[in-house]
């Protein structure tokens, strides 16, 4: 009998003596009280022993104790008290649980005097172990010696027999059991013959579906590498294979809530061997299930695309687009199902949404890694994958539990593990140092798509400057071609020619604008746009352009060159005179901000330009842009007209220059002017242009054969016939052009004959009765038909009178035997019999016709045309009096009568023998 003693500090020390067969005795000091408070849990003890090479070799030993504690029994046991000599336990074994162990039978090769290693003990925590008040020990009968060691557990469903294996180990080892429950109780057992590390995780019943426990433990399951063990574990715990250097025995105790105990237990009883084994391969099953799920989703989408190919093209395109949006996570599964039902007119599928939510992440990852391919569907982008794609890129690190000695303690909520990372050769190597894994909120940054930042050029505000009239300072911003390009601001200072300088006469000045390279690229706070230069009189084209750039960068951006402007000397001279008059009138400038819109490739923006405008005098006024002309009052319009007269009085060249620069303003101000005046200002001669347009008609008709000739007849046969005729007459063989001309003549002749026959056939099928221009003069057929109807009516009236007479004679009951009366009765009976026979025959015919089915009578084209035209013609004539539209058949049939009529009308055939032979047919 094994005894136990209670030491100070709530520690129970077990001796190293072996347990007797089938008996576990638990006794305690009367003065010691062991108290634990636990929620109803399901505790699983897993011990995985790795054998060590040497003289002592043993089998793997697996102990599974699965026990479910009921809250009602626990409360009843907590309320019971015991007498003196028995300790008080708040949590004890239920009444129906029996635990027994039996030592392994010695083999035949072993000697009997050699002592065998004792069976490893099963350590039960304080909230599980207890003693019933009346039964201090639990005893089982000894099992048969021929059987393997087993563990018998009694549950609510009956007894269960679990196999137990023994092993050997070094004699001097210390075992530490750390209880990380809410009570923080510690039980130590010394002098155990194996090296064992036990992690106990207690999950409260209230947090059954979450990974957060009361003590926030992180459990790392590890299996020794020297043996293979079958262990049953919940699906949310992952088992990793690690190589232990010393092959220790690792026992893991996991306490799971009572609500999940029924689903996590596996009870199998074998009738032949009497043993039950629990085998689980959660990782392989999960991988297979995920593969099947994403394959089903791929087949579903592929079949959907294949079915959409039978639909019209727009439907097929919409289905493909919808599936691509679903793969790219642009559409939720609910919206996908709704749109798919509307596209294909299908019935709703409520189970499809859940299936898509479960399988779409796996399918997206498989499409991204090219594991699966759907025809016509592109893989999703990387940012759609999220954590799924990140987990594939991160390296997988294996973890090994670091053994903890008796003197070492760990903080609640942390677990010390040793990380094994693969080296360059692929073999795992342990890293130096220790890693503490604690429960912290996840801090993972997902890779997101790069953002495009729209930066334009920084625009510097130029204040109004008081400068002489020879300069215009304008700020210009170049166009932006891409979102990532940065444009800079450019200052262009335009200097005008002095008033006293006069250009050389009879010369054209050519100025090229836009040959400037921008070297400053600075970020902008405004969207890029193009801006016009000024709203006043434009600068003279004979200016030298000077670009002043404020920058420190060396990047160059080319500006598209503008066309060369050519102006006559008279226009330049008039322009300078106008500038001089404006300079004498006023010595100050009014700076204005003009907002204009400039068309560009990008959306138009309102651009403000700080420009120096010309002074406004008493009699002169600058022309506003065309957009403002509509809102100008009458007085301002009169002033502008006076300004225009003053400008045009200086000469024809000055007016031409003004019209060149401000053509849009003048056109909007004066409305639709004479086109000749506008053309004359632009230097266009309308008479010359019209003569050129009319002169191109000379080339029409110069090339006769614009396309290749198509020969109607067979050219070799025709040439052979012509050769035979010319050889008989002793003539030379003609060229090929003669045969081509004969073929064209024959084609034209046949075309004329066919056209005439078509007209004759149309006249033949014409219905003259439907023509409103004709009136019937004689209708002999109608008259004969009317007389026939009169005769039929008279005959019917006589038959009715005779029938009535016969019926009256048949109904008479005179007793006088009259031979005439008898004949009339006989005739009446015969007539009735004939009527009955006729009715019976009619009924039989109707029945037979109904049995055969409806007869479809094919209507001829002529009948359809005549009947349709006749039925519609009466209504049309009666309502509107216009001619009805006669439906002509598209196919024209020409018969022999039409051919005879044609031959009678033609001069070549009217006296030919062919016509008379045709008469005889």
From Swiss-Prot:
Residues 66-85, 166-194, 423-442, 860-886 are annotated as: Disordered. Residues 290-386 form the TAFH domain. Keywords: Nucleus, Transcription, Transcription regulation. It is found in: Nucleus. Pfam families: TAF4, TAFH. One of its GO terms (biological process) is transcription initiation at RNA polymerase II promoter. GO terms for cellular component: nucleus; transcription factor TFIID complex. SUPFAM superfamilies: Histone-fold (SSF47113), TAFH domain-like (SSF158553). GO terms for molecular function: DNA binding; DNA-binding transcription factor binding; protein heterodimerization activity; TFIIA-class transcription factor complex binding. Belongs to the TFIID complex which is composed of TATA binding protein (Tbp) and a number of TBP-associated factors (TAFs). Interacts with TFIIA-L when in complex with Tbp. Interacts with Taf1, Taf5, Taf11 and Taf12. Belongs to the TAF4 family. TFIID is a multimeric protein complex that plays a central role in mediating promoter responses to various activators and repressors. May function as a coactivator by serving as a site of protein-protein contact between activators like Sp1 (or btd) and TFIID complex. This is Transcription initiation factor TFIID subunit 4. It comes from Drosophila melanogaster.
């Amino acid at each position: 009998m094994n005894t136990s003693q209670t030491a100070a500090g709530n520690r129970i020390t077990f001796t190293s003596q072996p347990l007797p067969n089938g008996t576990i005795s638990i006794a305690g000091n009367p003065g010691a009280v062991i108290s634990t408070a636990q929620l109803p849990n399901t505790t699983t003890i897993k011990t995985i022993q790795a054998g060590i090479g040497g003289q002592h070799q043993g089998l793997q030993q697996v102990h599974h104790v699965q026990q479910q504690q009921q809250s009602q029994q626990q409360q009843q046991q907590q309320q019971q008290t015991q007498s003196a000599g028995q300790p008080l336990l708040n949590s004890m074994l239920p009444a129906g649980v029996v635990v027994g162990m039996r030592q392994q039978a010695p083999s035949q090769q072993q000697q009997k005097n050699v002592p065998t290693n004792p069976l490893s003990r099963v350590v039960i925590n304080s909230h599980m172990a207890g003693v019933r008040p009346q039964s201090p020990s639990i005893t089982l009968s000894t099992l048969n010696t021929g059987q393997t060691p087993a563990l018998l557990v009694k549950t609510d469903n009956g007894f269960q027999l679990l196999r137990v294996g023994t092993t050997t180990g070094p004699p001097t080892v210390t075992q530490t059991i750390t209880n990380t429950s809410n009570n923080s109780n510690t039980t130590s057992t010394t002098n155990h013959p194996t090296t064992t590390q036990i992690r106990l995780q207690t999950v409260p019943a209230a947090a059954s579906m979450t990974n957060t426990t009361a003590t926030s433990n992180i459990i790392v399951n590890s299996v020794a590498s020297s043996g293979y063990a079958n262990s049953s574990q919940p699906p949310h715990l992952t088992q990793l294979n690690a190589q232990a250097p010393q092959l220790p025995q690792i026992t893991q105790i996991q306490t799971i809530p009572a609500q999940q105990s029924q689903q996590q237990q596996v009870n199998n009883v074998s009738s032949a061997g009497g043993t039950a084994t629990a085998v689980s391969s959660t990782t392989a099953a999960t991988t297979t299930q995920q593969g099947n799920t994403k394959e089903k989703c791929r087949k579903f989408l592929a079949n959907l695309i294949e079915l959409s190919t039978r639909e019209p093209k727009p439907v097929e395109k919409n289905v493909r687009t919808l599936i691509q949006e679903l793969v790219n996570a642009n559409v939720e599964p609910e919206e996908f199902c709704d749109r798919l039902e509307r596209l294909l007119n299908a019935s709703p599928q409520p189970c499809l949404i859940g299936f898509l939510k479960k399988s779409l992440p796996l399918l997206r990852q498989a499409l991204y890694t090219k594991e699966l391919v759907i025809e016509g569907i592109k893989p999703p982008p990387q940012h759609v994958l999220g954590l799924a794609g990140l987990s594939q890129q991160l390296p997988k690190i294996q973890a090994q539990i670091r053994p903890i000695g008796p003197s070492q303690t760990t903080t609640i909520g942390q677990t010390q593990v040793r990380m094994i990372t693969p080296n360059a050769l692929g073999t795992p190597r342990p890293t130096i140092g220790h890693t503490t894994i604690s429960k912290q909120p996840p801090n993972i940054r997902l890779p997101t798509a790069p953002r495009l930042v729209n930066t334009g050029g920084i625009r510097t505000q130029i204040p109004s400057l008081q400068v002489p009239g020879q300069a215009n300072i304008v700020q210009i911003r170049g166009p932006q071609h891409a979102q990532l390009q940065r444009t800079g601001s450019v200052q262009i200072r335009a200097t005008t020619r002095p008033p006293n300088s006069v250009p050389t006469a009879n010369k054209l000045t050519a100025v090229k604008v836009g040959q400037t390279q921008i070297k400053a690229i600075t970020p902008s706070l405004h969207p890029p746009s193009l801006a016009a230069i000024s709203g006043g009189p434009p600068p003279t084209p004979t200016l030298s352009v000077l670009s002043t750039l404020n920058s420190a960068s060396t990047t160059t951006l080319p500006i598209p060159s503008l066309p060369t402007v050519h102006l006559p000397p008279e226009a330049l001279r008039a322009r300078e005179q106008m500038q001089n008059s404006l300079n004498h009138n006023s010595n100050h400038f009014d700076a204005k901000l003009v907002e204009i819109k400039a068309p560009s490739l990008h959306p138009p923006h309102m651009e403000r330009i700080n420009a120096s405008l010309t002074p406004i005098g008493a009699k002169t006024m600058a022309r506003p842009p065309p957009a403002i002309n509509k809102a100008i009052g009458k007085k301002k319009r009169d002033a502008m007209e006076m300004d225009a007269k003053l400008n045009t009085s200086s000469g024809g060249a000055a007016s031409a220059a003004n019209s060149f620069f401000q053509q849009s303003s003048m056109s909007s101000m004066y409305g639709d002017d004479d086109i000749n005046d506008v053309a004359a200002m632009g230097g266009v001669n309308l008479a010359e242009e019209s003569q050129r347009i009319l002169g191109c008609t000379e080339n029409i008709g110069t090339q006769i054969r614009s396309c290749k000739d198509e020969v109607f007849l067979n050219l070799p046969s025709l040439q052979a016939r012509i050769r035979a005729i010319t050889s008989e007459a002793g003539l030379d063989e003609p060229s090929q052009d003669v045969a081509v001309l004969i073929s064209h003549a024959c084609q034209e002749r046949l075309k004329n004959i066919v056209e005439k026959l078509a007209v004759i056939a149309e006249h033949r099928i014409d219905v003259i009765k439907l023509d409103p221009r004709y009136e019937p003069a004689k209708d002999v057929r109608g008259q004969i038909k009317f007389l026939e109807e009169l005769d039929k009516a008279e005959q019917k009236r006589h038959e009715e009178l005779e029938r009535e007479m016969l019926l009256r004679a048949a109904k008479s009951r005179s007793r006088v035997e009259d031979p005439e009366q008898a004949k009339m009765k006989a005739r009446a009976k015969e007539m009735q019999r004939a009527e009955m026979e006729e009715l019976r025959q009619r009924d039989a015919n109707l029945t037979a016709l109904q049995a055969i089915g409806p007869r479809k009578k094919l209507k001829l084209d002529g009948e359809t045309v005549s009947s349709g035209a006749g039925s519609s013609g009466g209504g049309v004539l009666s309502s509107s009096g216009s001619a009805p539209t006669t439906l002509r058949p598209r196919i024209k049939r020409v018969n022999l009568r039409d051919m005879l009529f044609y031959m009678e009308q033609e001069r070549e055939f009217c006296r030919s023998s062919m016509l008379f032979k045709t008469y005889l047919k």
